[in-house]
């Protein structure tokens, strides 16, 4: 029986830890102190680290953790990611035999060019590509690239549990309501997620089914999101990537 825990780190990061009674795998452990405190208090050995992209809040623990636990570190091919033992690319798989896990690697560029996601045992570890009711900013990629990555994630089974790297859900819901405020599924999600945060509980993991019905960044094929893009751009027939780009631009303006 595996336990999945989102460990809060920094202001709003989550370090995802999947473990049994002896071994653990961690995703994007930017703060090694947070992770090691959890592991050591339970007598867990760190078998592997999975890194989604090169940003420091996702990679800052790599060097210390590899020295401390002699763990494998899987990451995309980028010299800015330290202490990597195994480079991964889309189409690869990662085995963690200590936990009986096999995870597929998906290339999900957009937030960064090197971004990958990991999928296995009904769980998606998507870093900063997909958030609760949102998606990552386009720091390196473009709208076509990110929309293709999100389409790939949306094609996973609806029961897939979505394990994002940041607790941004309530802010993302606030934005989503400005363009999709009549969506009853979104309003029900807001009720549930606000109650969770009021009790200091995470809003994650969500499910792909929930994201498909409430997240505007997975709904850019839908008629109401296309209508929003037409109003924003004045284009009579925008394609899916253009619709996504209009939603992303609106979110960037809303963020200020």
UniProtKB/Swiss-Prot annotation:
EC number(s) given by UniProt: 3.1.2.6
Binding site for Zn(2+) 1: 53, 55, 111, 128
Entry function: Thiolesterase that catalyzes the hydrolysis of S-D-lactoyl-glutathione to form glutathione and D-lactic acid.
KW Heme (keyword) present: no
Cofactor: Zn(2+)
Name under which the protein is recorded: Hydroxyacylglutathione hydrolase
Gene that produces this protein: gloB
Family: Belongs to the metallo-beta-lactamase superfamily. Glyoxalase II family.
GO biological process: methylglyoxal catabolic process to D-lactate via S-lactoyl-glutathione
């Amino acid at each position: 029986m595996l336990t999945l825990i989102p460990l809060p780190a920094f202001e709003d990061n989550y370090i995802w830890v999947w473990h049994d009674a002896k071994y653990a795998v961690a995703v994007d452990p930017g703060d090694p102190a947070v992770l090691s405190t959890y592991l050591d208090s339970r007598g867990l050995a760190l078998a592997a680290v999975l890194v989604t992209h090169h940003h420091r809040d996702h990679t800052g623990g790599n060097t210390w953790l590899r020295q401390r636990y002699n763990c494998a570190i899987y990451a995309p091919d980028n010299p800015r990611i330290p202490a990597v033992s195994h480079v991964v690319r889309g189409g690869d798989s990662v085995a963690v035999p200590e936990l009986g896990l096999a995870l597929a690697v998906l290339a999900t560029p957009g937030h960064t060019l090197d971004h990958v996601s990991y999928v296995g045992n009904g769980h998606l570890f998507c870093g900063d590509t997909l958030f609760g009711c949102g998606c990552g900013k386009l720091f390196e990629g473009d709208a076509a690239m990110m929309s293709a990555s999100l389409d790939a994630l949306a094609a996973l089974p609806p029961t897939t549990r979505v394990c994002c790297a940041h607790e941004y859900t309530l802010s993302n819901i606030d934005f989503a309501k400005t363009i999709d405020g009549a969506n009853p599924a979104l309003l029900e999600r807001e009720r549930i997620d606000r109650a969770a945060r009021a009790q200091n509980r995470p809003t994650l993991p969500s499910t792909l089914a929930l994201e498909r019905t409430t997240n505007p960044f997975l709904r850019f094929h839908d008629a109401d999101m296309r209508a929003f893009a037409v109003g924003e751009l004045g284009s009579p027939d925008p394609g899916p990537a253009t619709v996504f780009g209009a939603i992303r631009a609106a979110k960037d303006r809303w963020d200020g």
